From Swiss-Prot:
Primary localization class, coarse: plastid
Keywords: Chloroplast, Membrane, Photosynthesis, Photosystem I, Plastid, Thylakoid, Transmembrane, Transmembrane helix
Transmembrane segments: 7-29
Cellular location(s): Plastid, Chloroplast thylakoid membrane
GO annotation, biological process: photosynthesis
Function: May help in the organization of the PsaE and PsaF subunits.
PANTHER family registered for this protein in UniProt: PHOTOSYSTEM I REACTION CENTER SUBUNIT IX, PTHR36082
Family assignment from sequence similarity: Belongs to the PsaJ family.
Entry membrane topology: Single-pass membrane protein
Protein name from the UniProt record: Photosystem I reaction center subunit IX
Organism of derivation: Heterosigma akashiwo (strain NIES-293 / 8280G21-1)
Amino acid sequence: MDNFKKYLSTAPVLLTVWLSITASGIMIINRLYPDPLIFPI
């Protein structure tokens, strides 16, 4: 279990998780507001 925690804390794994979360958020925003040029601010 200790080796698994060390594996999860490595940079490529953290980068993959972070990029997946960011991409999911962008896809959700893009689905709700498909045209960012007319984004209601």
